[in-house]
Amino acid sequence: MENGHMNGVRTHHDRNSWTNGVNGGVAKREGSPDKGKAHANMSGSSVMMNGGGASFMDVDSQPPGGTKFNDLPDEIQHITADIMPLSLLLTRLSQWTHTKLQDEIAYLASKPLPQGVLNGTTNHQSADNHDTSQESLEKKVHLLNFLQDMHSKWVKTLVITEWSRKAAQVGALIDIRVHLLTKQAHYQELFWELIRMKQDLHWAKVPGPDLKTALEVLTTGQASWMPELGYIEPPPITWEEKEAFIDNINTMLSVRLTFDEHEKLPAAFRDYNIANGRVTFKVKGEFEVDLTIGDEDFEQQFWFIDFRFLFTPAPAELSHGVRTFLENKVNTILGDQGLAGCYNYLHEFVLTQKIIEFRRQATELAMGRWVDTLKVEKLNRAMSIQYWLKPPHGLEGPSSQTAKSWILLGVWSGKGVEGDLDSKPSSYISLRWFRDNKEVKDFDIPLNVETISAEKLLTAVIASHVEYILRSISSKLLSKPRFAQKHARLDLEISKEEPQNSSLAVQLFDNDKAVIKIEPLTGFFTMFPRSPVFLKGQMKLNTSSNVAEEGANLMEQLRFDHAVKDLNSRVRSIGWFVCRPPITQEETKTIVYSDASGSREAFKAVWLRKANWMTRQWFVMISMSLGGDQWWLVDLSPPKPNFPAGRLRLFTKMPMTSNQLTLSDTFFRNLSVYAAGMISHITDLRKLHTLKKSHTALELPNHSLPPQVRLPTIYVRLSEMLQQRPGSSSRTLTWAKDFVPIIFKGVRSHTGDQEGPADATAVRRDTPASIRAEARLTVIDRNKFKSLRGNVDHDVVYNHRTGQFSLKLRADMGTPVVDLLADRVQALERLMEFVEAIRLAGSNAIPQSVALREVVFTYSNDPAEPVVGPPQGPRAWNVHLDLPKDAKVVLTLEKGNPHIRALDMLQDMAQSTKTELLPSYLPFSLPLYRVLDRIEDEWESIAAKNAGNVAIVVKAAEWVTVRFTLPAPTTRRLLCLDIKTMGRKGRLLWHVKRTDEKGHERPLNAPQDEFDTLLQRSVWHAHGDGRKTFGTSAAADPKVGIETLLWSISESVKSLVGTLPPPPGTSPHPGGGTQDLQQGPQKTPQEMVAAQAAQAAQAAQAAQGMPPQRPKQQPPTPSQPQQQHRNVNQPQAQAQPQLHTQVQLQQAQVAQLQAQRQAQARANNSSNNNNTFVNRAHPGQPPQQRQSGPQTQAQQQQQRYQIQQQAQAMQRMQQQQQQQAAQQHAQQQGQGPQGQRSVHGQAGPQGVPQGQPGHGGGANGGMGGKNAPVVVID
């Protein structure tokens, strides 16, 4: 009967069992209706014992001390197994019925409705109005079957319920029957036990001895009581008969095995041999069996002859007892099962013998060399060998289970789990390996069952276990970036035969490696080389709970311990030392895990610092992990009182890999250089970033550093590094390229030891180190620096071949080098300004010594032609310029130098923006100052006699004042001369003119004195010797003319020494003495100016290549007498010169105003070309550049053409103004006749007749009064 099911839902029905049911439990219910069969004394609370008449449903519980069922004896055991309470049956059945009913309702609801119902056309033709559609009929049939099935089940339950009223009696009957069956079984077992005992005693039965027969047989050789049967012995068999008989048997065996037994022959028996009347079946690696036949009938069985083992070690022959047993057994099987049964039996027999041999050898090993390391256990046709009884890496402890490893060797039946035949046709010996309490499904351990060796098998298993452990550690390490990226070597050697030869070598540093081996007998780890660090790591491996998983981390810990130990012992001699972590672990993680490309493996940090680093906040940190070793350069802020440890300020990763960790002196010297270079690099970049300077970094070859050290080169803009010079709007150097590389050159201690190459001397720990760097400035034009020698300074070298300046920079550790670069470049720029100025000076200035802090050169005037006049002094003078780093330039002149009187002015010029003009100015002004010295020396004797003196005042570089003073009784006899520069026709000349006592220009109407007459006679009209005269002034060439000019003035003034001044109304006679002012015609100052202008115009025409024109006058006509001509010249000539003088004064004022404005504009643009001489007196002329060499003919022609064009334009403008002024004057006087205009001359192409007094118009205008040229050097 089915018990139903709960459908997975737990109910709260009563689960208590009846007394006669499960667990001896009881259940309670109301009494069932009495059908006349119940006892009168039964109630709902009656207790049912064994054999009681009440039903299980009427039993509540058994009261304590109640009687047993029917008072059965104690020998009868009460049966309670496999009995369930009736309530459980009813509950389960009701639940199952309810579930089935729900399923049935759902099923009927899922059935399709009748077609008529769907269409709305129900069939109403039936008399009983029942639905007779096919769908309804199927539902009804299905429901009827379900109800019939349920009805049958509940009827059966009803029958069981009725029988439950007699449950006590039935239970007692069951107990009695079981008791009787048990006794019957005892009797049968005893019977068979007696039979077996009788059979066993048969071998112990000894028959009684027949001594009489024995005595007769032993003495006579026969027994008289034995009857003679009279058998006739057959004739002996000959050899031919034997061979024929054997051949016959061989033939029958061959025929039988070929035709009759071919299909029945097992596959293992395919290898057989027929000879000597027997067939020998050979199963490789197992056995050989000899069989024969006893009858020609193929239906008869084979017979056993002999058996031999084919595996070793095995007995050569079977014992008599075993042979007899085997023969009987095999013959029986051959008779029943044939050859297949024979093979199966012998195959199983051999497998069992092999297992026995394995067990025997293992037992001997456990009692011999492998004592206390093996445990052999005998099983049914199987055995187990447990090795490494006390594994060092197992789980130890009261609550943990020791990891065990063993092999299980047994006979496998060859059947699958479900009983199907496996791929192997027969059973075989299988090997199962359990490693650390887990079975290994896939392994490659050779099992040799032909040559049995338990030791080799065990060695192979242990070798595989050792391989598993070492390979697990190796695989774990290889999965980490440090070994996956070949940053460290990992050598795994595996030996399948000798586990002690298997090893794992892990590289620690360079040649240092740790070799791990496992002792095959005990399983203990051994580590080489033998040292305290390795012994500690070996102990950790032996106590690990899971070496395969934790071995990689343990090896990394070992590497860190070894590294710290070696660093402490090696780096101290090189100046490094290991220090404590200056920051917390969390800050260290911030550094290590900042690399996005790195892994987040657990790491150990080693902090190093150089002893001779002046700064105490730079560290080198090594983060060692399986993710790879990383080297970091860390900068910490100074410690604070509340936070003693330094705070993290900057860190950068050093591009070094683990294979560079050689822990040698060479490596740490290179590390010192590299770290110092990085510190210098970072410090410079930080400084440049703070100053907001443009910069970049490129990695270029640096042969000053070891090949292993590669540092980037910083490029900066030279224009940004230079400070703004006073008075200059540009910071760009014109002589050097703008980009300057700063190349790191190594580290040098203050004692001079270099920490660069590997063979450098070791630096003392207490010796401060400094950074060495080099900045290279590439010049644009190498020809400008031919005068420089190799060593410009002790730390500045110029290479003529490459055209580069090498600036050696040295700074303390942590100090920016760019600050020194700016200072050196400024000093070098100042030097180059002097060198360029000396070069532009040409042959007049020759450099003698050029250094960064000192420049010495010689200068001279180098006249083009010999000077006639005063005696010449030395032609070359030395100038010494001291260029200190932070102080002003100091200019030193040798004794006797004519420029000593202008030393202060020269000193100021060297400090100003006109420094580059100094080398050109000195030879330019040397003749001037030389003649001034001569003049001053010449007048010393005169001054000593109080006959006169001379005073020379240097007001500016282009302005010198000379005052000649002669004694006079009433008035001062004073001649003041201004000597200034002027530009003319592209040349710079010295212009000498007379001024008043206060230095102002003399008015045009000033009375003429003795000095004017003297200068007009002997100076202002003298030509040649490099002089140009302008009537009231003169200009002289700076090389050959200025000395002659000034000397002639000095000699002329000396001629007045000792003479008396002329009386009033007289003027000095040209030949000496005085002349009356009333005698003869006297020229007014205006007439003199006009005459000078005419002379200047003639000079301009001569310069332009035009022939001089004589004054044009109309010849006198008869109608015009001579007196009229004189009258015209007398009264009207007085107005005409005055008018023309006013026009010239206006022109001079306009020209001077324009010259001042243009000079001011050019002064503002003077920074564009500091070597330009600006002519402020002639604004129409362009600024003239100093020529570095002689001009070509084309350049001279072009320059001459420009000057002519400018002169003609100036002349035309002046003539037009003069013509307009003359017409206006004529209109005012009312003179219209042609004859009067002819007095002035005919108007020609030049506008005004040349040569007329007061109408001269040169190309350069007048040179007197306010229109006198003023030339300055800018």
Curated annotation (Swiss-Prot):
Keywords: Activator, Nucleus, Transcription, Transcription regulation. Residues 27-37 have a biased composition (Basic and acidic residues). Residues 1253-1265 have a biased composition (Gly residues). Residues 1075-1085 have a biased composition (Polar residues). It comes from the Eukaryota. Pfam families: Med14. Disulfide bonds: none annotated. Residues 1-40, 1056-1142, 1155-1274 are annotated as: Disordered. It is found in: Nucleus. GO terms for molecular function: transcription coregulator activity. Residues 1108-1119 have a biased composition (Pro residues). One of its GO terms (biological process) is regulation of transcription by RNA polymerase II. PANTHER family: MEDIATOR COMPLEX SUBUNIT, MEDIATOR OF RNA POLYMERASE II TRANSCRIPTION SUBUNIT 14. Component of the Mediator complex, a coactivator involved in the regulated transcription of nearly all RNA polymerase II-dependent genes. Mediator functions as a bridge to convey information from gene-specific regulatory proteins to the basal RNA polymerase II transcription machinery. Mediator is recruited to promoters by direct interactions with regulatory proteins and serves as a scaffold for the assembly of a functional preinitiation complex with RNA polymerase II and the general transcription factors. Belongs to the Mediator complex subunit 14 family. This is Mediator of RNA polymerase II transcription subunit 14. It comes from Neurospora crassa (strain ATCC 24698 / 74-OR23-1A / CBS 708.71 / DSM 1257 / FGSC 987).
